[in-house]
Amino acid sequence: MKKFLVFFLAILALTFVACGKDKNLESYLDMEKIQSEFNIDEKDDEHIKFKDKDEPRSAYRIFNFQKMKSVDFKNPKKIDKLEEFYLGKNCDIIYKDESTIIILVLVQDNSYAYNIQSFDDSKTELMIAVSIGSDKELSETELFNLLDEAKSFIK
């Protein structure tokens, strides 16, 4: 159930993203680290999606990195649009600032589903999405640690 929920969350996370066309995305990411620790689900020049290897875990994670067009990345309302989208789906906003939004998407049968979306321009204009399925409620600190882990893949 957790894996299905997280897959669904990953699809939701990509709803508002448009691709850029400059450098290959792999040139910005630590692919060696990603390949050693995760299973890559999808990969092309503008997008990579990878998830936990099938090990028993209390939190199952799917990471998405997507290059964006500059005009979309610089849209000052992108986080507000995401917030509006998630609120329309009856989700709870846990945290929001100008570059990051953390959402509790679903609580069902002692399972929790979260989405974290963040925008990073330290190397290129990237959308980072982390979808998490957990058998326990995660604190805001734990969710930020997962975002930090996602950002650690950027070279």
Regions found by a protein language model. Name each.
Residues 15-18:
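C-terminal motif of bacterial Sec signal peptides marking the signal peptidase cleavage site
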Residues 1-4:
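Positively charged n-region of N-terminal signal peptides that target proteins for export
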Residues 89-155:
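A short, solvent-exposed beta-edge/loop patch
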Residues 20-22:
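Bacterial signal peptide processing site
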Residues 27-32, 36-110:
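Short, solvent-exposed recognition patches
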Residues 11-12:
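Repetitive helical segments and hydrophobic/amphipathic motifs
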